[in-house]
């Protein structure tokens, strides 16, 4: 039986990282220590807001994860991944994931790099902003004294019904989600990102 439960366990995060390494690009993968630090300290650094992680298990084996940020304005889904061998249960997993996100009583937004992902989310009630959206991030897999800005076309979706304004939502994601993440690495990365956003 598949279960989805919240976790901050160091052991769980290590198992989740193994799945991430199978499917994510190197610049999208963070170290265990950095991930755990962020999970444990986010709500202390930003009062009233939180970073959450849910492990997806089948018979006590971790097969995926859902993570995101509860901001004051809305929920941002950060990572959502399920091991390929268990995607036959994707309908149940998606419905359970959405119910978990709805429990926060806030609007929900999610990024989708591909049209196939967009179609998947749209099957479960998400709608795509018609405005063009850029995925802007820094390559944190590089050496500490260097950084590289990665920018490519993506899509931003919201769970309907929702009255979020696109431009405000986009800027909030850039400045309150990504910029905060880079701040745990070093000042250079944060300055690079601020420069890109012109803030």
Which residue stretches match the model-derived regions?
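A conserved beta-strand-loop-helix scaffold within acyl/acetyltransferase catalytic domains
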Residues: 13-83
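Residue-level recognition of the GNAT/N-acetyltransferase active site
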Residues: 82-85, 113
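Terminal substrate-recognition subdomain of acyl/acetyltransferases
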Residues: 109-199
């Amino acid at each position: 039986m598949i279960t989805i439960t919240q976790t901050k366990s160091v052991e769980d995060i290590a198992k989740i990282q193994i799945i991430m390494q199978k499917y994510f690009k190197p610049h999208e993968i963070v170290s265990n220590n950095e991930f755990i630090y962020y999970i444990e300290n986010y709500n202390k650094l930003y009062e009233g807001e939180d970073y959450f992680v849910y492990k997806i298990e089948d018979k006590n084996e971790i097969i995926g994860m859902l993570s995101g940020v509860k901001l004051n304005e809305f929920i941002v889904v950060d990572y959502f991944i399920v091991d390929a061998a268990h995607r036959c249960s994707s309908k149940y997993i998606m419905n359970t994931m959405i119910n978990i996100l709805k429990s926060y009583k806030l609007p929900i937004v999610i990024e989708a790099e591909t049209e196939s992902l967009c179609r998947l989310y749209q099957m479960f009630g998400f709608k795509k902003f018609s405005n063009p959206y850029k995925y802007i991030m820094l390559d944190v897999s590089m050496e500490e004294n260097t950084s590289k800005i990665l920018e490519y076309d993506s899509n931003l979706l919201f769970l309907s019904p929702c009255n979020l304004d696109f431009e405000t939502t986009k800027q909030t994601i850039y400045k309150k989600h990504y910029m905060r993440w880079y701040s745990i690495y070093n000042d250079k990365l944060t300055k690079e990102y601020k420069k890109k956003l012109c803030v």
